[in-house]
A protein has these predicted regions:
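Compositionally biased, low-complexity intrinsically disordered regions
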Residues: 5-6, 19, 145
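Bacterial N-terminal signal peptides
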Residues: 17-25
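Exposed, flexible binding/inhibitory loops of compact, secreted disulfide-stabilized domains
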Residues: 28-156
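N-terminal secretory signal peptides that target proteins for export/translocation
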Residues: 1-12
């Protein structure tokens, strides 16, 4: 009977230790899932921009339609252009982040066939980010692979 009680106590201790270790690992691991929700073109003109979008109205003014759930997430929109020939698209090489900065390495790829003449447009990529990682004042910068600045903003 004593043996069974000892095993039971050891099992409880092992279970609690495993649970505690699991929680420590989960708390220490702050992986954030950023989803690319949409990519395309918009006829809303302007230059290169990186914008933080917190509501449907602002997203609509950019000419972007996407099912963003603003109650639990926010959008980050990279706009590049304008262009007057069809076929441009954005290529995002990497996204890196720390507590003070988010760095996006991206560029636009020109069409292989030089494209067709078109009304001016800009390309965009929309990322969805959970609200739990929103930190006012964090710098968001977009650079080319050769480290030339494209656009910068701060989380308001």
């Amino acid at each position: 009977m004593r043996r069974a009680a000892k095993r039971s106590a050891v099992m409880r201790w092992s279970t609690l230790a495993g649970l505690a270790l699991g929680l420590i690992v989960l708390v220490g691991c702050r992986e954030v899932r950023v989803r690319t929700l949409a990519a395309g073109t918009t006829t809303v003109l302007g230059g290169n921009q990186i914008l933080i979008v917190r509501d449907e109205v602002t997203l609509g003014k950019l000419g972007v339609r996407a099912p963003v759930h603003f109650k639990g997430e926010f959008g980050v929109v990279l706009l590049m252009g304008p262009h007057d020939r069809t076929g441009y698209k954005q290529i995002v090489e990497s996204i890196g982040a720390n507590t003070q900065r988010v760095r996006v390495v991206a560029f636009e790829q020109a069409p292989a066939d030089a494209g067709e003449p078109s009304p001016q447009y800009r390309t965009y990529t929309l990322w969805i980010v959970p609200n739990r990682v929103y930190r006012r004042g964090v710098r968001v910068e977009v650079v080319t692979p050769s480290d030339e600045p494209i656009a910068t903003t701060y989380l308001p």
